[in-house]
Regions:
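Hydrophobic/aromatic beta-strand elements that line small-molecule binding cavities or substrate pockets
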Residues: 7-9, 50-56, 75-82, 93
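Intrinsic-disorder/low-complexity, polar/charged segments enriched in Ser/Thr/Lys/Arg/Asp/Glu/Gln
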Residues: 2-10, 61, 73-75, 86-90
């Protein structure tokens, strides 16, 4: 099953400011929903049952490839697009789920992912508004 999921928000700040907020998961991650991914080595992040490898993707502020579980293949990334007086912060997931992971994505992971991403965008907005 193909997966494509996108969230975006117009944020009243320059791209550099937003890049600094998403460079460290602890600053914007909604820990009231789920623990922030933890660095495991140089470019690996442990997010509970998922393991991500950070990689360089042209045009992306941050990008990750799914390492585990094997039933998911794909990437997710943050992009920053300059807009008039603001920046569009966009997060995209593209990949596929196979076997039992099709139902796991639809029933558990996608709804949680949507909650986390919308809360993360709220946290970025709040940090910008407060001058954090």
């Amino acid at each position: 099953m193909k997966i494509r999921n996108r969230h975006q928000r117009m944020v009243a700040a320059p791209p550099e400011r937003i890049a600094a907020l998403i460079a460290d998961f602890d600053r914007a991650w909604p820990t009231e929903i789920a623990p922030a991914p933890r660095r495991q080595g140089h470019r690996l992040y442990d997010a509970g049952p998922m393991l991500w490898e950070e990689f360089d993707r042209p045009g992306a502020a941050r990008a990750f490839r799914v390492v585990r579980p094997e039933g998911f293949q794909g990437e997710h990334w943050f992009e920053l697009e300059l807009a008039e007086g603001a920046t569009v912060l966009r997060h995209t997931v593209e990949g596929c789920a196979v076997g039992k992971y099709e139902a796991i994505w639809r029933e558990r992971i996608e709804p949680l992912h949507d909650l986390i991403l919308e809360a993360l965008l709220d946290n970025v907005d709040a940090a910008v508004a407060s001058g954090d």
